[in-house]
Amino acid sequence: MVNFTIDQIRHMMNMTHNIRNLSVVAHVDHGKSTLTDALVSKAGIISKKAAGDARFTDTRADEQERCITIKSTGISLYFEYDPETIDKQAAAPLNPTEEGDPTEEDIEIKQNSYLINLIDSPGHVDFSSEVTASLRVTDGALVVVDSVGGVCVQTETVLRQALAERIRPVLSCMCNKLDRVIAELQLDPEEAYHKLMKSVESVNVIIATYPDEAVGDIQVYPNQGTVAFGSGLQQWGFTRKFARLYAKKFGIDETKMMERLWGDYFFDAENKKWAKTDKKDERKAQGKKPLKRAFVQFVLDPVYGLYRALNEGRTEKYMKMLDTLGVTLTSEEKDLRDKALVKRVMSKWLPAADALLEMIVLHLPSPVDAQKYRAPLLYDGPEDDEACTAMKKCDPNGCLMMYVSKMVPTADQSRFYAFGRVFSGIIRSGQKVRILGPKYSATNKSDLLIKSVQRTVIMMGRYVEQVADIPCGNTCGLVGVDQYILKQATLTDCESAMTIKMMKFSVSPVVRVAVEPKNPGDLPRLVEGLKRLSKSDPMVVVITNTEAGEHIIAGAGELHLEICLKDLQDDFMKGTPIKISPPVVEFRESVNQATTEPGLAKSPNKHNRLYVNVEPMPDGLAQEIEDQKVTPEQEFKERARYMSTTYGMDVELMRKIWAFGPNGNGPNIFCEATHGVQYLNEIKESVVAGFGAACAAGPIVDEPCRNVLCKLMDVTLHADSIHRGMGQIMPPARRVVLGTMLKAEPILVEPVFLCEIQVPRAVSGGIYGVLTRRRGHVFEEIDEVGTPMMNIKSYLPVAESFGFTQDLRGATAGQAFPQCVFSHWQAYNGGDPLTEGTKTNEMVKSIRNRKGLAPEVPTPERYLDKL
């Protein structure tokens, strides 16, 4: 039975000190959704019996079929928590609500009630954008780590994303699947301790690379209750439970006991003394066994003892243990056998939901605390303006600031809920709001609409509940604004407010397919379906090539594309049949060396001449531009100094950067290196437009350029301005960049996946052959000590990744589990793209043929002029 009403949840929304917003993040298959079930079950939404198997937050049919989470799902849960077991420090003063001072009812609620806005996010790397969208609107992250597999590539990726957003990794790293350590690996308790310690240390190593004074120390410490251990599937787990138990038994302080239950603390039962070593040699001489580690003696030994007694069906032993522990079983529960018995008994003794709830309440920040340090990072305007001040205070009486991070389709797929977080103010049904799009800025205010919100709703997993308004510090859905928002937006009622920064994704949409309807008459339905698909997924990119008449969908990987195409056909086109091209990969064009002499292009009227040199940029600079560490908005002297000291570039030249391209922020740079040219500033806009067009479609295969530095060496201009307008300057500016690139040893650049493969050591030999055939190579092998598994890290070109998983499973009898995440760009290793017969040249021809271009690459003479 559900333990709360929507009215209670709405009432709790005013109590910002008692709200916790968190995302559950982890590597795929590490047990996020089963663990989330524990909290959903405690709130009474699903039965305890179903918890762990129901995966309530996996709302789509294909999520249940595939047993993986595809879309992040939000749910608001109301909990009453026993105040005796909560630190008194956790109780903070109430925020006065709009209605005035807190009432007696509020104070009563304050003592033991909490609202947890939880988002269960996907673990598969192809759906990383869903994780980014959920992290943006939450303040903490429950990082789930498989006790057997340890910290994997995606654990690391999502943890880094969380830290970059100033999100506390719920300091609550849940070492999950402890049941597998006991039953499958059959490690003894001391080995199990070292296995768990390795997982905790791996998480802390990643956290240590993101020091941030504003957030403070966010490393995870089991002896402070910020790490839980347990099993999501069997619904048991613990943090402080054992410390509380022994503190009561021995009559000592719980905090002191907690400190000694992790690390190098050993208890000498004979002398009733603590030691920092196991005194192995000393005790061996006395004919005694070494001292046991406190975590092993007081925590793992009882867990192992009960677990094994239950598994082996030793009724007398486990009933005696349960009697000692104060756990009583009903007659129905006593009749259970095998896994059902283990799950019921362990979850009764060590309920996972209680451990998680305690960790969330005590160690996660409330919106009031979190927004103090998150608001300056997220807000794209001055820190002292009205909007940012309201966000920092999480002020319900301040101006409205809400960030929409994703669009969630309604049950019938016809409309969308705009899902996001209210950072300040209150959003109401019927309220008029300013919708600021991603291009809105202080200088460009065109991306702005003023519209009314029809309804505000609370997202409850697969259901929604309507409420009149939502105050700050909460996540919610909006109805009626979906046609004005593509993917992300800022909603405000303050005229001076700037946007909340757009999200940065950890993956890139590098895999593409072209789609067309089988029946040409269904083209309008396809176009409408593509619009809805683009809205429904934060990452997918839909490109319409009007010249070739093709519609392209770009995704992060094979699985991401497969899900997008299924959604397009089944949901957004209601089953209309479509034709899908084989997947292709996005390439980039670049140059391998600097030109020895500048290329020349003349304007159509022959009165103006542009001379340009091109060269490759220093290694790493293009990546920093893509990561927005070097941006067009930076102060130009400071940026020039940084590029000079970091990359050894000419500081004077770097002060004269005219543009980044394409789109004004791409990984190519155009600099002005002329001397004493008249009217130069008058043609700047036209030259930059030409450079942007050249960067958007390079000379070899019409793909975007990357890592190209263009220098304008000289210009000859007509004295009369009418002869040097946009139409006269932009075409030669584009041509001179393309032509000069062809003289600078052009290269094709391809995307590369970092592929982490978990595989049993016995069958790992087959992996190397599969990788070699696909131009991949292994760069690191890690043995999982104490297990038959090993981790193989390799690089694999994205172009060779199609069907890789099937090949790998075939070569390893189905036992290899790969995870591929976009890593970097590298030159296509197949010879000169312009030389007939090379592998790269064949690739160039196939791309040109697919795009409907002439098979031969143009020569420099096609673009450049002679004196």
From Swiss-Prot:
PTM annotation: Phosphorylation by EF-2 kinase completely inactivates EF-2.
GO CC term (a single one): cytosol
SUPFAM superfamilies: EF-G C-terminal domain-like, P-loop containing nucleoside triphosphate hydrolases, Ribosomal protein S5 domain 2-like, Translation proteins
Keywords, sorted A to Z: Cytoplasm, Elongation factor, GTP-binding, Hydrolase, Nucleotide-binding, Phosphoprotein, Protein biosynthesis
Source organism superkingdom: Eukaryota
Cell compartments where the protein resides: Cytoplasm
SMART domains, A to Z: EFG_C, EFG_IV
Phosphothreonine PTM sites in chain numbering: 57, 59
Major localisation: cytoplasm
Reaction it catalyzes: GTP + H2O = GDP + phosphate + H(+)
PROSITE patterns reported in the protein's UniProt record: G_TR_1, G_TR_2
Cystine residue pairs: none
Residues that bind GTP: 26-33, 176-179, 231-233
First-level EC class: hydrolase
Entry's family note: Belongs to the TRAFAC class translation factor GTPase superfamily. Classic translation factor GTPase family. EF-G/EF-2 subfamily.
PANTHER family in the record: EUKARYOTIC TRANSLATION ELONGATION FACTOR 2 (PTHR42908:SF10), TRANSLATION ELONGATION FACTOR-RELATED (PTHR42908)
Annotated protein name in UniProt: Elongation factor 2
Taxonomic source organism: Blastocystis hominis
